[in-house]
Amino acid sequence: MAGIKALISLSFGGAIGLMFLMLGCALPIYNQYWPLFVLFFYILSPIPYCIARRLVDDTDAMSNACKELAIFLTTGIVVSAFGLPIVFARANLIEWGACALVLTGNTVIFATILGFFLVFGSNDDFSWQQW
C-alpha cells in the first residue's frame, strides 16, 4: 500500500508542476508559449542515469566513473532547464512573472523526478525496472 501512496503523491506532484508551467504560458497577461520548451528537458533529464544504470555493473571499476558522468550530464540538463526561462525573460520573450511560474514548475517537476528514482530506484520487487 505504501507504493500506491508514493505513486499517487508523485503523480500529484507532476500535475502541480505542469500546472505552474501552463499558468506561466497561458495566463492572459503572459500569453507566450516559449516556456514549453522546458518539456524537452523534463524528458531528457532521466535518460543519462537510466542508461548508466543499465550499462554499469557494480563489480566493474569503471562503474563509478560512468555513474558520475551520467549525474554530470543530468545536472547539465537540469541547470539548462532552469536557465532557459531566465534567458527568455532577459530577452523579453516572456514576462518575469511567467519566468517565476516556470521556475516554480521546474522545481516541482524535478523534485518529482528525483522522488520517483528514490522511491522506485531500489533493486527489490517494487522497482521501476520491472516496468
Swiss-Prot record:
GO terms for cellular component: endosome; membrane. Pfam families: Vps55 (PF04133). The keyword RNA-binding does not apply. Its main location: membrane. It is found in: Membrane. InterPro entries: Vps55/LEPROT. The keyword Zinc-finger does not apply. Keywords: Membrane, Transmembrane, Transmembrane helix. The chain crosses the membrane at residues 7-27, 32-52, 69-89, 100-120. This is Leptin receptor overlapping transcript-like 1. It comes from Bos taurus.
